């Protein structure tokens, strides 16, 4: 695809390192250690779309692959990251072109939805994205919980990865409809990622048997727990565990923790924006204990194949959908919906567990 004298294309994997200079320019706050990790271990697995002018990369968009649970099924989806445009090429529609190209390919693969963590939601709303997950946050002062009942803590090593993967899957599937599959490969990479951010993955345990985990970074000597998962019923022993592990820290910031640990100072903020990619595949992937019937029309400028009027039914066994013929539209008068509205209606925020660690 070409725009003026610029070309839009997906890079061959051997070319991915060509985007590093733009990455370092657009994301100057990322440490050298993290950028090294990203290009050594992550970028090779990504799909990278770029706008080129001759040999110069003007803009880029990365698709990070994840296996994602959705109502009992597992789907290969993509997390949109590292969207950036060189300063002199901004406000020329390059990001829209990259989104359109990447969404088209995801549509061809029948991916139900995609997601991203926006720097500014206003950038993505015009393209069918809407907030569909949130994250809680509170500050913990470790010394206030010294002497409280506490889970054991120990630094996760590669030998702990199989147990972590099994425990995380067991805990998350009981509560959430949507979450990234916690495989051994997922945790192996997470160990490296946290090391690149001067942090760790910490196992929460009872008599050395894993009962959960926490993920934290400590860049600039500021501790931030980015995700905390623990077996139901053991939440009250988490604060004591934090007091032991972070004994010398005056305070720590905690994100993405169980609701039972929320207090009057807890803040909840929108986190991830999602977008339906293949509308029919999305509806067919859903399940609902209470049957849901829908009759609606959608206009999708980015993926015109989704545009139309539909009738859908979602049951405990899955979803069924069909596109209405013109004569049916006049009779049934389908409700006009935005893509983001439909996504939010069918996947409530509390059913989704997608954090920065994904």
Enumerate the language-model features and the residues they cover:
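Conserved acetyl-CoA binding element of GNAT-fold acetyltransferases
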Residues: 75-87, 222-232
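Conserved acetyl-CoA pyrophosphate-binding loop and the N-cap/start of the following alpha-helix
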Residues: 89-101, 233-242
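Conserved GNAT acetyl-CoA-binding A-motif
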Residues: 106-118, 247-258
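Amide-forming acyltransferase catalytic core, primarily the GNAT-like/NAT-type
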Residues: 134-241, 245, 257-261, 274, ...
């Amino acid at each position: 695809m070409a725009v003026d004298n610029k070309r839009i294309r997906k890079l061959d994997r051997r070319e991915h390192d060509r985007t590093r200079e733009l990455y370092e320019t657009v994301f100057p706050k990322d440490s050298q250690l993290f950028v090294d990790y990203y290009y050594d271990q992550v970028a090779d697995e990504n799909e990278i779309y770029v706008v080129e002018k001759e040999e110069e990369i003007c803009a880029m968009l990365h698709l990070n692959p994840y296996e994602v649970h959705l109502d009992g099924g597992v789907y290969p989806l993509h997390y949109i990251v590292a969207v950036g445009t060189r300063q002199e090429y901004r406000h020329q529609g390059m990001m829209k072109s990259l989104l359109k190209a990447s969404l088209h390919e995801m549509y061809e693969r029948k991916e139900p939805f995609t997601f991203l963590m926006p720097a500014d939601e206003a950038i993505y709303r015009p393209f069918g994205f809407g907030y569909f997950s949130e994250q809680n946050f509170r500050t913990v002062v470790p010394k206030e919980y010294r002497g409280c009942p506490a889970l054991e803590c120990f630094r996760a090593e590669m030998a702990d990865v199989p147990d972590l993967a099994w425990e995380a899957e067991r805990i998350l599937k009981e509560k959430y409809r949507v979450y990234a599959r916690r495989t051994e490969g997922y945790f192996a990479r997470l160990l490296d990622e946290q090391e690149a951010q001067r942090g760790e993955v910490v196992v929460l345990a009872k008599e050395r048997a894993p009962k959960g985990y926490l993920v934290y970074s400590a860049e600039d000597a500021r501790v931030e727990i980015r995700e905390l998962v623990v077996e139901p019923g053991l939440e009250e022993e988490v604060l004591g565990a934090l007091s032991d592990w972070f004994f010398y820290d005056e305070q720590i910031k905690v994100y993405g923790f169980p609701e039972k640990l929320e207090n009057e100072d807890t803040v909840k903020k929108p986190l991830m924006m999602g977008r339906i990619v293949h509308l029919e595949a999305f509806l067919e992937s859903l399940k609902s204990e209470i049957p849901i019937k829908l009759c609606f029309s959608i206009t999708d400028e980015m993926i015109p194949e989704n545009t139309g009027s539909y009738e859908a039914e979602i049951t405990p066994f899955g979803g069924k959908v069909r596109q209405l013929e013109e004569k049916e539209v006049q009779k049934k008068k389908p409700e006009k919906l935005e893509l983001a509205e439909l996504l939010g209606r069918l996947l409530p925020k509390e059913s989704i567990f997608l954090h920065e660690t994904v």
